[in-house]
């Protein structure tokens, strides 16, 4: 189920407290926040629970959540069977 339209997109209050300096701190803990147009072209670091993942925000990412771009689980690698 998607979010109700009347509520609008969720953006963590942390982004509103910043003083407009885009280069001072680009680390984002809030994976649940929606990517807004003001982030286009900026490189941000998203925390996946283990390390910081650096991602450059592009126009296609608007409307998605930050957490979609920093995976929290390790990809499985299947070993080849030897005969």
Curated annotation (Swiss-Prot):
The domain of life is Eukaryota
Where is the signal peptide, in residue numbers? Answer: none
Alphabetical keyword list: Mitochondrion, Ribonucleoprotein, Ribosomal protein
UniProt main location, coarse: mitochondrion
BP GO terms, sorted:
ribosomal small subunit assembly; translation
Q: Where in the cell is it found?
A: Mitochondrion
User: What does the record give under GO molecular function?
Assistant: RNA binding; structural constituent of ribosome
Matches recorded under InterPro entries: Ribosomal_uS19 (IPR002222), Ribosomal_uS19_bac-type (IPR005732), Ribosomal_uS19_CS (IPR020934), Ribosomal_uS19_SF (IPR023575)
Q: Which Pfam families has this protein been placed in?
A: Ribosomal_S19
GO CC, sorted alphabetically, is: mitochondrial small ribosomal subunit
List, alphabetically, the PANTHER family matched.
RIBOSOMAL PROTEIN S19P FAMILY MEMBER, SMALL RIBOSOMAL SUBUNIT PROTEIN US19M
HAMAP family for the chain: Ribosomal_uS19
Family label: Belongs to the universal ribosomal protein uS19 family.
UniProt protein name: Small ribosomal subunit protein uS19m
Q: Which gene encodes it?
A: RPS19
């Amino acid at each position: 189920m998607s979010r109700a339209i009347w509520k609008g997109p969720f953006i963590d209050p942390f982004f509103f407290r910043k003083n407009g300096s885009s280069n001072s701190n680009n680390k984002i803990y809030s994976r649940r926040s929606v990517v807004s147009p003001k982030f286009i072209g900026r490189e941000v670091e998203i925390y996946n629970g283990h390390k910081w993942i650096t991602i450059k925000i592009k126009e296609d990412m608007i409307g998605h959540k930050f957490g979609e771009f920093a995976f929290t689980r390790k990809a499985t690698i299947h070993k080849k069977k030897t005969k």
